[in-house]
């Protein structure tokens, strides 16, 4: 009797391949997540610089910074949720000095404690990104 050789993989070979793929995925997923966090942090840094340039242009033209009366305003609900459409948390800056105010690049926004914030009495200002940078572990900047 002749034996016919069947082509294919054994169940053991398939299990080995699946195990190797699972291990590779376990290694790659955290690396990709870290690179996404770093990319969002780089975007936030660029946004801060862009707004700084717009604020300085506003001051050159008006003699003061856009005032919030000294109160904090921001796109996150914890800062009043002003203009999450990226138009209202820095008064009078859009559209003359900047096309739109930045939104946090994290797609899960709005979140109560992450986003951009601004405060000014007209003479000076504070502008920042709350709960960032993401790429640092908590407590280890």
Where are the regions that the model predicts?
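N-terminal cationic leader/targeting segments used for protein routing and processing
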Residues: 3-6, 122, 127, 141
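Aliphatic-rich helix starts adjacent to a transmembrane/signal segment
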Residues: 31-50
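Extracellular/periplasmic head regions of type IV pilus-like filament subunits
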Residues: 56-129
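N-terminal single-pass transmembrane signal-anchor helix
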Residues: 2-32
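Amphipathic alpha-helical segments that mediate coupling or scaffolding at interfaces
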Residues: 14, 35-38, 58
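Short, low-complexity, Pro/Ser/Thr/Gly-rich segments in the mature regions of secreted, periplasmic
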Residues: 133-141
């Amino acid at each position: 009797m002749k034996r016919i050789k069947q082509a294919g993989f054994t169940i053991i070979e398939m299990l080995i391949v699946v195990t190797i793929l699972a291990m590779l995925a376990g290694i790659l997923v955290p690396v990709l997540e870290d690179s996404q966090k770093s990319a969002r942090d780089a975007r936030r840094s660029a946004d801060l610089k862009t707004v700084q340039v717009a604020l300085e242009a506003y001051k050159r033209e008006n003699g003061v910074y856009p005032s919030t009366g000294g109160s904090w305003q921001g796109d996150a609900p914890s800062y009043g949720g002003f203009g999450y459409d990226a138009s209202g948390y820095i008064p009078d800056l859009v559209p003359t000095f900047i096309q739109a105010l930045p939104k946090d690049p994290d797609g899960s926004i709005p979140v109560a404690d992450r986003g951009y914030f601004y405060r000014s009495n007209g003479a000076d200002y504070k502008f920042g990104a709350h709960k960032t940078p993401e790429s640092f572990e908590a407590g280890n900047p």
